[in-house]
Amino acid sequence: MKAWVLKRLGGPLELVDLPEPEAEEGEAVLRVEAVGLNFADHLMRLGAYLTRLHPPFIPGMEVVGVVEGRRYAALVPQGGLAERVGVPKGALLPLPEGLSPEEAKALAQSLPPP
């Protein structure tokens, strides 16, 4: 799968090929359709966010995508800027039909942290 990876704090994102994630216990793999990026993602890229991640990592916390034919929004600690991401099943918010992925990503920002 393709993913945008940050290899060093403050550096550019690089588009790379990675193995597809496998669902761990209690998780589902979400096929990402849209990602909300905001100031928290920028701070994470600089290493200045409350939760400090160590490179390399895939940014993107607010995601919208599909699991088994159903569209969901979710807030994940990282990994949204990839074609697929593992999400705890309890973090998946089912979305109503007719809501576009771009509209739905705004909902992910209001979800409780994982």
Q: Which residues does each PLM region occupy?
A:
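Extreme N-terminal starter segment of soluble prokaryotic enzymes
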Residues: 1-2
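A glycine-rich, Thr/Ser-enriched phosphate-binding loop motif common to dinucleotide/cofactor-binding enzymes
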Residues: 99-114
